[in-house]
């Protein structure tokens, strides 16, 4: 039991590390352009979100009642396996979506004039598969590792919804005929639902 639990935990952590390294490297090859002040505002928002998340995680980690709850309730093999499965599916979705969008990927705050409408790969079914993949990864981590991640899932969901709406406004302006048609036949985050 202990070995499976540890393997699941290390698998989830390893996927997060691979995701961060891949994203950092892939960011070097995106199209440049757009409003730099918007990029700075977006970066400030992400930094604030990151600081709040880390502060909350540190606070919860130091809380003895939280720590006891975490180990009593959330450290089971079925939950760890379920969490690892969610993280794996989420990572696969995010990687596939990132590959499909290619050089068009970038910060939601940067509105590039040479943006292309990508409707292939996972974008054929959902409009924001990277956000969906990351939310699946966060949900899996909260199920398999720690309930503190639920706070992260809630904050990230709010941020992703805000970013998705902003991106959709831009894409509607950029592709006034094609994007509304694409939007009508796809869902925002969850195929056939949302």
Protein language model features and the residues they cover:
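Membrane-anchoring alpha-helices and their flanking helix-loop junctions
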Residues: 1-112, 116-119, 137-194
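Solvent-exposed interhelical
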Residues: 115-126, 130-131
């Amino acid at each position: 039991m202990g070995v499976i639990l540890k393997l699941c935990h290390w698998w989830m952590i390893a996927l997060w590390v691979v995701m961060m390294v891949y994203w950092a490297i892939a960011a070097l090859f995106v199209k440049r352009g757009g409003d730099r002040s918007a990029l700075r505002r977006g970066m400030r928002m992400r930094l604030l979100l990151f600081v709040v998340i880390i502060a909350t995680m540190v606070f919860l980690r130091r809380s003895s009642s939280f720590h006891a709850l975490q180990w009593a309730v959330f450290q089971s093999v079925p939950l760890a396996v379920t969490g690892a499965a969610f993280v794996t599916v989420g990572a696969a979705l995010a990687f596939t979506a990132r590959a499909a969008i290619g050089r068009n990927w970038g910060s939601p705050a940067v509105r590039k004039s040479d943006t292309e409408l990508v409707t292939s790969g996972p974008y054929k079914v959902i409009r924001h598969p990277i956000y969906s993949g990351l939310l699946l990864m966060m949900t899996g981590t909260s199920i398999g590792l720690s309930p503190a991640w639920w706070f992260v899932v809630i904050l990230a969901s709010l941020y992703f919804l805000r970013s998705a709406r902003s991106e959709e406004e831009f894409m509607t302006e950029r592709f006034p005929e094609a994007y509304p048609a694409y939007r009508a036949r796809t869902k925002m985050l969850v195929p056939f639902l949302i």
